[in-house]
Every structure is written in structure tokens, then in C-alpha cells.
């Protein structure tokens, strides 16, 4: 679509919404912008681009959708919104920022520009960051963008203005972004895993999986290499007979192209086929789930023919991301980890399975309609006690009851940390891995992590002070 003079309704004024406003205004579109919040972010910035009479805050109204040529929808706004559905039925296109980005790349990017696209319930930000570091270490100019930030269109405009195109785009994509994307042509793409998530937005996990699988729906040709997790049946079922597949998993590779784990000496190695590549003990990030992340990142980078040596060097030095299995403190023989980014079951299960020690688990929050029963087995295997807080604490407790692990209820994060420290024995881990969203008690998962860390630091100071007094 040529957007010059076209009437486009942009829904949402968050980071993605403002990026679409800026991009579409460059293309000469006639914009109106709406957000269901009465005081949305970026209102002042948008009012500099869009006339005040074309900006609407509060519940969406039918008249907003009259006479428009397209809807540019932010990931935070559901396509299932009745007024959006009514517009779709009338033939109005509904697009998102990644669709606009994909069309722009086709038009403006130099030939040979590569795209690696990453999605999944858990680990997608980590893998996207890994890929960025690995590609950079291999000597290519890389732009990491999408759900990870910056917004893809913001990164695109910055690159265009500087006339400095990257060799490769590493894109983290959410299911919400993929729903409205049909023109993206990645050279390789992965769905890392699937676990129950966002079931407040999807009717079933099958519908959620179908949204994720759109990452492989490359138009015009089947040149996208599918990087598939063979340990996840729903992901493995996404294999397309017209595309090339490379699998990764925690089992030994069966073919020369597959990535997996192999024993070697007293260690376990990342491997491709029968070739030992890197000891898992050399990874700076802990846990088997991070070994799987590293294997996926290797498979993606090798799909665009980058050499192994700089990729492996980057993996040795990659230190992980904030609030994802991040060590906060260690005192009195107890280690505290912040995994506040764990907003669903799958990420909490992965975190627990990554530990060989006894864990005091802090969990709970807004469960987003998830079935918590998959927590029962890892809790039974790895957890000494569970400390629960938040709106859906009772649902979590019910799901893990059969594990016979003691459950303690608290009302604040401070109390959760205090109780956990009292329960912990020498050599134990206190792990904040909530398996839930944070908005029932906190501004976001970062705020939840900050409150957790502050509570840990307070106990640490008291402990150190007491120890000094005793001496």
C-alpha cells in the first residue's frame, strides 16, 4: 500500500505505537491515534506529530473506525477487539509495526541484508541478545530490535537517517506482533519453545502456537531455514516440508546438522553432529535452559554461514540479561537469584530444572489464566519450600499440592524474602521465579525485581552487621 494521503488509525501510544506514528507520518499518511488509557504515555510527543483533534484517549468508539484505509495496531491491543474485528470484516487491513518494517526493508534495504527472527514463550530476549553479540563478534554490523527494544521502526529510521544499513537484523518477535505480519522474509527463524502463556489473549494454546508459527510464513518463496526445538512437540510439528530444518535440543544430535549436548570427559559439551564445540561449564550463564538458548543461537548464526570460532568466543563472554536468572547476593551460605522475567509456567519450570540444589521458590502473581500443573514435577524434584504471594497464589498452591513441599503464604515481597531466608539452609538457593505476570502488585516485572533485590540487600546488611557485632 502507498500510504501517502491514506487515512490510518494507529491504536496504542506505547513505544511501538509512537514508532508507527513517526514512520507513517514520514510516508505522508493522514493519521488518527487512539489509546484506551485516559492518560497514555507519549501523548505530548504524538501531539507534536498529529493534530489534537485526531488524538483520542479512553474507550474505543465506533466513529474512530469510519472511513479509514487501514489500522496500524500495537501489540498491546488485541486483534480480537470487537471494533477491530468489525473493521477486518469490512476489508480494512490490520497491520503492525513488523509488517511496516518488513515492507520497508524490501523497498529500501541494500541487497544481501540478512534477517534472523526469534520467538518463543521463553528465552527469546536472551537468544536475540546472544545472536547480536555473536554476529558482532563475527565482524558484521548487526541491529538488534523488535520486542527486545528498540522498536524495529525506530531502529530502521535511525539507520536510514545515518545511511548506515546493517549486514543483519536480529529481531525478537512476540506472538502479538506476528499476528499482523505477513511480509517478513527471514533467512532463518526459530520458535524456541511453547508453554501456556497469554491465554488471556488466546482461546487455546493451539491458537497461540499458530500465531508463533507465522514467523516461518515467508512469502513468495520458501528460503527460510527453520530452527526447531526437537524437545518441544508443538514446535517440532511446525516443520514445513518445503523448507530446510535444523533442530536443537538437550539430547545428543542424531544427524551432522543437528545441534545438541554430548558428554566429553567430566563435562557436557555443546555440539553439532559429533563435533564437540564448547563445554557448558564455559558458558557464563547458568542452567540447562541457557545451554538450549546457546544451541539455538548457534543454529541461527550458522544458517547465515558465520564461522564457528567468533560465535563460540561470544558465547563464552555473554553474561546474560537483567532479571533472568541473575545472581543478586550470596551470604550465610544462601544464594539469591532474580528471575522476575519469569512471567509464565515454562520459564519457571526451566529455571527450576537448571538447579541441582535445594531451592526456596518465591512464586505467584497474575497467572493470566495458565494451568499451573506443570510446576508440580520440578517443585517436587528441586524445591525445599515454596513461598507464594499475589492474586493467583491459591491456584499455584492447588497445582503443586501433590508435591508435598511445604507452602508458605505471604502478602508482600519483603515478607517473602524474609520467610525464604529463614527457611533456607546452608547451600540452598532462594529463587524469585514467579511463573506469573506482575501487574497485580507491581508496575512491571522490573519493579518486582527491584523490590525483591532491595529486600535481599536489607537482609544482607543486617546479617553482615550482626556478624560484625558478634566478632
UniProtKB/Swiss-Prot annotation:
Pfam hit, one: Mur_ligase_C
InterPro entries: Mur-like_cat_sf (IPR036565), Mur_ligase_C (IPR004101), Mur_ligase_C_dom_sf (IPR036615), Mur_ligase_cen (IPR013221), MurD (IPR005762)
Main function: Cell wall formation. Catalyzes the addition of glutamate to the nucleotide precursor UDP-N-acetylmuramoyl-L-alanine (UMA).
EC top class named in words: ligase
Family to which this protein belongs: Belongs to the MurCDEF family.
Gene3D superfamilies assigned: Mur ligase, C-terminal domain, Mur-like, catalytic domain, NAD(P)-binding Rossmann-like Domain
Family matches, as PANTHER family: UDP-N-ACETYLMURAMOYLALANINE--D-GLUTAMATE LIGASE
Organism whose genome encodes this protein: Nitrosomonas europaea (strain ATCC 19718 / CIP 103999 / KCTC 2705 / NBRC 14298)
Pathway linked to the protein: Cell wall biogenesis; peptidoglycan biosynthesis
Gene Ontology terms, MF aspect: ATP binding; UDP-N-acetylmuramoylalanine-D-glutamate ligase activity
Reaction it catalyzes: UDP-N-acetyl-alpha-D-muramoyl-L-alanine + D-glutamate + ATP = UDP-N-acetyl-alpha-D-muramoyl-L-alanyl-D-glutamate + ADP + phosphate + H(+)
Name of this protein: UDP-N-acetylmuramoylalanine--D-glutamate ligase
Gene Ontology cellular component list: cytoplasm
Positions contributing to ATP binding: 120-126
Keyword Transmembrane: no
HAMAP family (UniProt xref): MurD
Compartments reported by the entry: Cytoplasm
Keywords: ATP-binding, Cell cycle, Cell division, Cell shape, Cell wall biogenesis/degradation, Cytoplasm, Ligase, Nucleotide-binding, Peptidoglycan synthesis
GO term, biological process aspect, one: peptidoglycan biosynthetic process
Assigned EC number: 6.3.2.9
Amino acid at each position: 500500500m502507498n500510504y501517502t494521503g491514506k487515512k490510518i488509525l494507529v491504536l496504542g501510544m506505547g513505544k511501538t505505537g509512537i514508532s508507527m506514528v513517526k514512520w507513517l507520518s514520514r510516508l505522508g499518511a493522514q493519521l488518527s491515534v487512539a489509546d484506551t488509557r485516559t492518560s497514555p504515555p507519549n501523548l505530548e510527543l504524538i501531539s507534536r506529530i498529529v493534530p489534537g483533534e485526531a488524538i483520542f484517549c479512553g474507550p474505543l468508539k465506533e466513529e474512530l473506525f469510519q472511513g479509514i484505509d487501514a489500522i496500524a495496531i500495537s501489540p498491546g491491543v488485541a486483534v480480537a477487539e470487537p471494533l477491530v474485528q468489525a473493521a477486518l470484516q469490512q476489508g480494512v487491513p490490520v497491520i503492525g509495526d513488523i509488517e511496516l518494517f518488513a515492507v520497508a526493508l524490501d523497498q529500501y534495504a541494500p541487497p544481501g541484508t540478512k534477517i534472523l527472527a526469534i520467538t518463543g514463550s521463553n528465552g527469546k530476549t536472551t537468544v536475540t541478545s546472544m545472536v547480536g553479540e555473536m554476529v558482532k563478534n563475527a565482524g558484521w554490523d548487526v541491529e538488534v530490535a523488535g520486542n527486545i527494544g528498540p522498536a524495529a521502526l525506530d531502529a530502521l529510521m535511525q539507520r536510514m537517517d545515518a545511511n548506515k544499513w546493517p549486514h543483519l537484523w536480529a529481531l525478537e518477535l512476540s506472538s502479538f506482533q506476528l499476528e499482523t505480519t505477513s511480509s517478513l522474509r527471514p533467512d532463518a527463524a526459530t520458535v524456541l519453545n511453547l508453554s501456556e502463556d497469554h491465554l488471556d489473549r488466546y482461546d487455546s494454546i493451539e491458537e497461540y502456537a499458530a500465531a508463533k508459527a507465522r514467523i516461518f510464513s515467508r512469502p513468495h518463496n520458501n528460503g527460510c531455514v527453520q530452527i526447531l526445538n526437537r524437545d518441544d512437540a508443538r514446535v517440532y510439528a511446525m516443520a514445513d516440508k518445503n523448507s530446510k530444518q535444523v533442530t536443537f535440543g538437550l539430547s545428543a544430535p542424531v544427524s551432522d546438522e543437528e545441534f545438541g549436548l554430548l558428554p566429553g570427559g567430566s563435562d557436557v559439551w555443546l555440539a553439532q553432529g559429533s563435533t564437540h564445540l564448547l563445554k557448558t561449564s564455559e558458558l557464563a550463564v547458568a542452567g540447562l535452559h541457557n545451554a538450549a538458548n546457546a544451541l539455538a543461537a548457534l543454529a541461527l548464526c550458522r544458517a547465515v554461514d558465520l564461522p564457528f570460532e567468533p560465535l563460540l568466543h561470544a558465547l563464552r563472554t555473554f553474561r546474560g540479561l537483567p532479571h533472568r536468572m541473575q545472581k543478586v547476593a550470596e551470604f550465610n551460605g544462601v544464594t539469591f537469584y532474580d528471575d522476575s522475567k519469569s512471567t509464565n509456567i515454562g520459564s519457571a519450570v526451566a529455571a527450576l530444572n537448571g538447579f541441582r540444589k535445594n531451592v526456596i521458590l518465591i512464586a505467584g502473581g497474575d497467572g493470566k489464566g495458565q494451568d499451573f500443573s506443570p510446576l508440580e514435577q520440578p517443585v517436587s524434584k528441586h524445591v525445599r519450600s515454596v513461598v507464594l504471594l499475589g492474586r493467583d497464589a491459591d491456584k499455584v498452591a492447588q497445582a503443586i499440592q501433590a508435591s508435598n513441599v511445604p507452602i508458605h503464604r505471604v502478602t508482600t515481597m519483603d515478607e517473602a524474602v524474609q520467610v525464604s531466608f529463614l527457611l533456607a539452609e546452608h547451600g540452598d538457593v532462594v529463587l524469585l521465579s514467579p511463573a506469573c505476570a506482575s501487574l497485580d502488585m507491581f508496575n512491571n516485572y522490573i519493579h518486582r525485581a527491584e523490590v525483591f533485590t532491595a529486600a535481599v540487600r536489607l537482609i544482607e546488611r543486617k546479617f553482615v552487621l550482626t556478624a560484625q557485632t558478634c566478632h
